[in-house]
Design a protein with these regions (language model features):
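Glycosyltransferase catalytic domains, chiefly GT-A lineage
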Residues: 1-245
Length: 245
């Protein structure tokens, strides 16, 4: 494989310098919603965050097929064994304060309560892995909602909020891919199949993980043993494997 094009990101949506604070890398939070502008000569676009890697090429095939059939192909952050990501603070018995990621971010970004409530408990869409066609209506919807989110909200995470609103509020035609196409290690660590040298889902039938994503770091639990076959003896087999700088 080789790199054919490298483009320098721009501020595709104007934001005040008070929000940027010399963090030019935040351009990437906006520029991914404008990929066809930077690379116009392609039919399909696949985005994979730099803290994720392809463990099984089947995930790439599904990303391509998914965006060819619908406007967007993406994974919902919900799977058997995933940590509870719907935070709610209860008081006085039946009253509660909703603290989900989508709800909090929507309110902070100036979206009305109707929209915030609609996405509050919708399975979060992690934007670290997705695909879209060049002519997908998703680009315009995403950019519209991103511009709104940036008008009052913070830069970091706004592109994720915008895509969630595009899908759950605007009704963007979406192919929801298996969790193996964007396995979030901070929610549930995988197992490692030593015989085939591949990461697999920790629950039966231990399917191969397509793309392993370190979003949010690593689920912090002591003495984790990722071996699928406990009879195999390996000295510190995963030391440093999940280290992030």
């Amino acid at each position: 494989s080789k790199v054919k094009e490298i483009k320098k990101a721009e501020w595709d949506i104007e934001v005040p310098s008070s929000k940027i604070k010399n963090r030019e890398w935040l351009k990437s939070q906006i520029s991914r919603a404008f990929l066809p502008k930077y690379f116009p000569n392609y039919e399909n676009y696949i985005w994979i965050d730099s803290d994720a890697w392809v463990n099984d090429w089947v995930a790439i095939d599904l990303l391509i097929k998914g965006c060819e059939q619908k406007s967007l192909a993406i994974t919902q952050t919900i799977a058997p064994g995933y940590k509870d990501v719907g935070k709610v603070k209860w008081f006085l018995g039946s009253f509660a304060i909703v603290k989900t990621q989508n709800f909090k971010h929507a309110i902070r970004s100036g979206f009305d309560y109707k929209i915030a409530r609609k996405i509050a408990f919708a399975p979060h869409l992690n934007i670290g892995v997705f695909s879209m066609k060049r002519n997908s209506e998703g680009w315009n919807l995403w950019q519209k909602n991103l511009k709104k989110a940036l008008s009052k909200g913070r830069i970091f995470g706004s592109e994720g909020l915008a895509i969630n609103i595009s899908v759950y509020v605007d009704g963007l035609d979406t192919e929801f891919l298996p969790n193996s196409c964007n396995w979030i290690a901070s929610h549930l660590l995988p197992k490692y199949d030593e015989n085939n040298s591949v990461f697999v889902e920790p629950n039966l039938p231990n399917n191969k993980i397509g793309i392993l994503h370190l979003a949010g770091g690593i689920y912090n639990e002591q003495n984790i043993d990722l071996r699928d076959d406990k009879n195999i003896k390996i000295k510190e087999p995963f030391k440093g494997l999940f280290t992030q700088g």
